[in-house]
Design a protein with these regions (language model features):
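An extracytoplasmic/periplasmic, membrane-proximal ligand-sensing/linker region
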Residues: 29, 176, 241, 263-327
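Hinge/capping helix and adjacent helix->loop/strand transition within the periplasmic-binding protein
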Residues: 81-88, 101-188, 239, 252-285
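Bacterial N-terminal signal peptides
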Residues: 6-16
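N-terminal (or domain-start) structured segment
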Residues: 22-112, 151-153, 159, 175-204, ...
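Positively charged n-region of N-terminal signal peptides that target proteins for export
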Residues: 1-4
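Extracytoplasmic/secreted proteins, especially bacterial periplasmic and envelope-associated proteins
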Residues: 44, 48, 52, 74, ...
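A ligand-binding cleft/hinge motif common to bilobed small-molecule-binding domains
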Residues: 95-105, 169-173, 200-236
């Protein structure tokens, strides 16, 4: 009987210690890995998020660690292999879903090596062109595209960039192959579009809105399924409404943890994320970036997981059909 009582007491003590450990989370700084260089859009989102996320995590410091390279797969791989204790998280964008198709030798499995914490924001995209194009709306642009097959240049910011992915889907949707012109970043691509050296580009509102407002490029449509409310873009039709049924592209960001992270920790981080995304200053900063903070069901881990899986299934065939790989 004494042995039994001792065993029960020991079990009770171990359970109590485990509960206390979870209750104390976090008791040290948390690291959010950004799989891209400092200063970029994803880095900016992570730093803004870290400032408000800490409020729901015992006010612990949130450290941003930039681990760039290989289209975001190096940083993601680091998190996949990290201790599943809630102290190493990943903030990634649409590349989380496109990497499995772009890279034929992946160092991790997106769907089985991570816990999904929730979606953070999404950035719409716009189809834009040089000001000397004869078209002034999408209907006219579509006629011009059909009349100039084999002569059209489509710029992007480089292999696997958002503008590259949107451009691939656009070409397949209009069933017209265009000459893809990859640049080393959005800056030089936009410079040549403004200068008239290339014809078209599909890029984030973060990069195009000011140029549209300044009359330096023409805007023909938005890539999202719903019209935008930004004054400079509110009158633009969606590509879906212009006959490209189902066309819906945005650059989104999500938060992830290593597989096996305790549910109690995941729940706490998700609760902190929900609170952070309601912070007025954070919302304003995202709006200034041209991003829309997520407030729908995709904030839930299970729903974000479904969303990412659907994105993988959407982009896989597009990338494979184009035969453009990153490795």
């Amino acid at each position: 009987m004494k042995r039994l009582l001792s065993l029960v007491a020991a079990l009770g003590l171990s359970v109590g210690l485990a509960s206390n450990a979870l209750a104390a989370y976090p008791d040290k700084p948390i690291t959010i890995v950004v799989p891209f260089a400092a200063g970029g859009p994803t880095d900016k989102v992570a730093r803004d998020l870290g400032e408000v996320l800490r409020k729901g995590l015992n006010n612990q410091s949130v450290i941003i660690e930039n681990v760039g390279g290989a289209g975001g797969t190096l940083g993601a791989a680091k998190v996949a292999k990290a201790a599943p204790d809630g102290y190493t998280l990943l903030l990634h964008h649409i590349g989380m879903a496109t990497a499995p198709a772009l890279y034929r030798k992946m160092p991790y499995n997106v769907m089985s090596d991570f816990e999904f914490l929730g979606m953070v924001n999404e950035v719409p995209m716009t189809l834009v062109g040089r000001t000397t194009l004869p078209a002034n709306n999408f209907a006219e642009l579509r006629k011009w595209i059909d009349a100039n097959k084999g002569k059209i240049n489509l710029a992007n910011a480089g292999l696997a960039a958002a503008s590259h992915l949107c451009g691939l889907l656009f070409q397949q949707s209009v069933a017209v192959d265009m000459t893809t012109v990859p640049y080393k970043g959005t800056g030089p691509a936009m410079t040549d579009l403004i200068g008239g050296q290339v014809d078209l580009m599909c890029d984030q509102t973060t990069n195009t809105t000011a140029q549209i407002e300044g009359g330096k490029i023409k805007a023909f449509a938005v890539s999202t399924s719903k019209p935008l409310t930004t004054p400079a873009l509110a009158k633009l039709p969606t590509l879906d409404s212009q006959g490209l049924k189902g066309f819906n592209v945005s650059i989104w960001h999500g938060l992830y943890a290593p597989k096996g992270t305790p549910k109690a920790v995941l729940d706490q981080v998700n609760a902190a994320l929900r609170t952070a995304l309601k912070d007025p200053e954070f919302v304003k900063r995202q709006q200034d970036l041209g991003a829309v903070v997520v407030t729908d069901e995709r904030l839930a881990p299970a729903e974000h997981r479904k969303f990412v899986e659907a994105e993988i299934n959407k982009w896989g065939p597009v990338i494979k059909a184009a035969g453009q790989y990153a490795d």
